[in-house]
Design a protein with these regions (language model features):
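N-terminal amphipathic alpha-helix/helix-capping segment at the start of soluble metabolic enzymes
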Residues: 1-18, 76, 267-270
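Structural preference for beta-strand elements that scaffold enzyme active sites
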Residues: 15-19, 48-52, 88-90, 107-108, ...
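Glycine-rich, proline-tolerant flexible connector loops at the mouths of alpha/beta enzymes
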Residues: 18, 22-31, 49-71, 236-245
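A cross-domain feature marking catalytic cores of carbohydrate-active enzymes
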Residues: 22, 51-55, 91-93, 113, ...
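Alpha-helix-loop-beta-strand connector modules within alpha/beta enzyme cores
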Residues: 37-40, 44-45, 64-90, 125-131, ...
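Active-site-adjacent loop and "lid" segments of alpha/beta metabolic enzymes
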Residues: 64-72, 108-115, 171-178, 199-224, ...
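Catalytic beta/alpha-barrel core
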Residues: 69-70, 84-98, 107-120, 131-142, ...
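Catalytic alpha/beta core domains of metabolic enzymes, predominantly
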Residues: 129, 133-235
């Protein structure tokens, strides 16, 4: 399935779609650079592309972690990406009050995994009329996400999608149960695999979340093989210098070779 977005018709091919970008808006130049490069890659490969970057990061390990360059400035940069490059925008919200404001720019409002049970937040996002992407909590079963989907639909918005981002495995690790895609697709909505956050290693004593970016290709290949509708990847030209989530990002230079491999898998299973 493909997300229904006004102004962005569904593709005529059967490729998966891609949600990708940096974790957070770091500045105008680098954000536009990343968006432009991903767009060029996806245009060449005929992959539908949605640009994702948070305009603020509310859920951080440490009080001293980077949270953003300023809400208004970050949203203005996302608007520039949207208008200059004609790319649909995905960004996350954390409170009901952010929904209407972020919806002025975003085409898809993303609900963070830790907040996927927050009824008021889901309803507020739904009432904007924008597509709502709910990330499955690390503590939630695939089957239980039906309730989150129903909250959005019963608020009057049929445009909803789900994202798998791993399940807590002990104190400092996550695993992906690939059986879950079938259960989530039974909600008759697009289901996405987050190939980078599902490889996080949270709760580190340092206060900085770790990750296994060396396994991004493994997770992505498995996700395409089992039939996820879309893939989510955070990427950056220099992940070690990224201001958020650098430990589990895909280097931007590795994106195109990976997508080429994934398209071959997609073609083989259709």
């Amino acid at each position: 399935m493909f997300p229904e977005l006004p102004g962005y018709p569904a593709p005529k091919n059967d490729n998966f779609f891609l949600i990708a970008g940096p974790c957070v808006v770091e500045g105008e130049e680098i954000t536009l650079r990343i968006a432009r490069e991903i767009k060029n890659i996806c245009s060449e490969l005929d992959i539908p592309f949605f640009f994702k970057a948070s305009y603020k990061k509310a859920n951080r390990s440490s009080l001293h972690s980077f949270t953003g360059i300023g809400d208004e400035q970050a949203l203005a940069i996302l608007r520039e990406v949207k208008e200059e490059l004609h790319i649909p925008i995905v960004t996350d919200i954390h409170t009901e009050g952010e929904a209407v404001w972020a919806a002025q720019v975003a085409d898809i409002l993303q609900i963070p995994a830790f907040l996927c049970r927050q009824t008021d937040l889901l309803v507020a996002a739904a009432k904007t009329g924008k597509t709502v992407n709910i990330k499955k909590g690390q503590f939630m079963s695939p089957e239980s996400m039906r309730n989150a989907v129903e909250k959005v639909r019963e608020a009057g918005n049929p445009h909803v999608m789900l994202t798998e981002r791993g399940t807590t495995f002990g104190y400092q690790d996550l695993v992906v149960d690939f059986r879950g895609v079938k259960a989530m697709q039974e909600n008759r909505c697009p289901v996405v695999l987050d190939c980078t956050h599902s490889l996080q290693q949270p709760n580190q004593p340092s206060g900085v979340t770790g990750g296994r970016p060396d396994l991004i290709e493994t997770i992505a290949r498995a996700g395409v093989a089992v039939g996820f509708d879309g893939l989510f990847m955070e990427t950056h030209p220099e992940p070690p210098k990224a201001l958020s989530d650098g430990a589990n990002m895909l280097p931007l230079s590795e994106l195109k070779p990976l997508l080429v491999k994934l398209l071959r898998i997609r073609k083989a299973i259709l």
